[in-house]
Amino acid sequence: MTAEQAHGQGGYIGKALRRREDVRFVQGQGRYVDDIVLPGVAWCAFVRSPHAHARIRALSTKAAAMRPGVLLTLTAEDWAKAGHGELTVVHPMSFSDGRPMNAAPRPAFARGKVHHIGDIVAAVVAESRFAAEEAAEAVEVDYSPLPAVVAVRAAVAPAAPLVHAQFGTNVVFEIERGNRRRTEAAMASAAKVVELDLKNNRLSANPIEPRSYLCDYDAANDCYTLYATSQQPHYLRRWLSVYTLHIPEHKLRVISPDVGGGFGAKGIFSTEVSTGVWAAQLLRRPVKWTATRTETFLSDAQARDHDTTARMGFDRHGRIVAMQIDTLAALGAKLLRYAPSAAKVSTCIATMRPWRSKPMRAVVS
């Protein structure tokens, strides 16, 4: 379309446009993952930790395996025996001094310890959703609770309990952008300095449609079809292929039908989908999982939770002469794919770039 056509008669600029995609949704004709029913489908349910931090002293699925309709139980031990992989961060962030990021991988099942409420310790697959959820309650887990913190400033205190002891700290990375010396000098000479402490609360996307996965395994051709509530189906296929199940990419088809809200949470690769695909392959039949609303709050990717101290220096005419931002970003007990880079972008890039060139400094941890 030429510029003349866009602005002229029959063009679109400056005119209200009639939406064309809404009719089938308001008539109840949308097709979501949970609407898809395959013959012989089995259901998956997960056993999740009720503790924010605890040692797993014992785990037994024997009682659950004997429940009516149960087809399969899975734990970290089974995952390791199968040789499957773990999730890693897509965009790692290093420290400003060059040290690598303190990033622990995300296993499909907790091993030895749980690191947050909702951490998965086992899975049960059964003939029906009810049977799977009932059997999941029969899985026996002996926990030994450990100290935990939920506030980001408490997490960086000297005596804070460590989420991943091997790093010796709860700080994942620290990046500084800008010129510290020039910013401090400009701030010292400013006619007025305003300082503000800001709390950007943690949030859950909580879409109307919860996360849901349905995997169909074709044993004759050794290939998979995965229906997923995913905002990024191509990435999802690659992650299953490269990082976790090591399925050749050409043997895995991922379909995202209508998605009932995502807001970023459905763009994150979750561990539940790996388990469902694996279970479908083991059982040679379709396997489905749809999160409950409780699971949505416990296990969906969350956002924000930043504690920020912002300082701005002004000259006697009220013009900005310097700006300094220090942010603590709570990334959770287990890193999600883009979380570190998102914290960097929101603090170091989105905050600094709109302003005219002047001494600025931003630090995000």
Predicted regions, residues:
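Flexible, low-hydrophobicity surface segments
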Residues: 1-173, 193-196, 282
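Beta-strand segments within the central parallel beta-sheet cores of soluble alpha/beta enzyme folds
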Residues: 250-257, 284-294, 322-326, 354
